[in-house]
Amino acid sequence: STPLYGGTETLIRKILPEWGIGGEPFADGLAPAQIEAALEAAAARGKVSLVYIETPANPTNALVDFELVARSLAAFEARHGYRPVSACDNTMLGPIFQHPIGEGIDLSVYSLTKYVGGHSDLVAGGVTGSAALIGRLKATRGAFGSQLDPHSSWMIARSMETLVLRMRRAAASASRVAHWLADNPIRKLQVLHPQLNADPAYQAVVRRQCSGAGSTFSIVLGGGRAAAFRFINALALFKSAVSLGGTESLVCHPASTTHSGVPADVRAHVGV
């Protein structure tokens, strides 16, 4: 799916092709035709090994329907005789507000740096899934050097004790800020927050697979980059920095930071 976190976009679009691995994006995770078309376009080029999605998407909060992905993969298996592995970047809502594996997705991927770590003091990632799939990942982990150091592992274990409390409080605070921005009388803004998307299909997916809205959202300002940075520089409480899920309130301009490595035409297509 697209958009993805900027680092993931760079991995899929720039690094994996150097290893002979290609990708076929779809932008609307609520549209069966787009998912089917992406699967068939990828299959025409070779074996489809992985369907990788991120929902809600960073930074637009676009959704991908888990049930739709599962049905599309079942139909693909009926046509082609095999089923690609599915994986979801669940960083934005998980592991508290969304559970992809319970909805038919094979692997759930996390930046543990964010909400799970929760204090902006470590860099880590995690993946959950069946014993068979995790066993395959463990077999290659040593070759890629992705073992986490003991101290960071201890800090993650420490942070998980307060994860539910932190995520619920952050989500409640973000909801108040998002609604104030959307309703403020000074300047009308488009606020990309799950509670403020009026599309019935979007809200149906929210009700079905999300138990909360999370605390990361975006706003759309007229005036381009200059207006965005005037807004950022005028804030007093929010710090201009990348990342999310910590105890501080942060704001950033994605096109200049997290998604700066994504080609401009791709950013324009997905609204970043």
Predicted feature locations:
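Conserved C-terminal alpha-helix-loop-beta "cap" of PLP-dependent enzymes
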Residues: 188-272
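Conserved PLP-enzyme active-site core in the AAT-like
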Residues: 1-187, 192
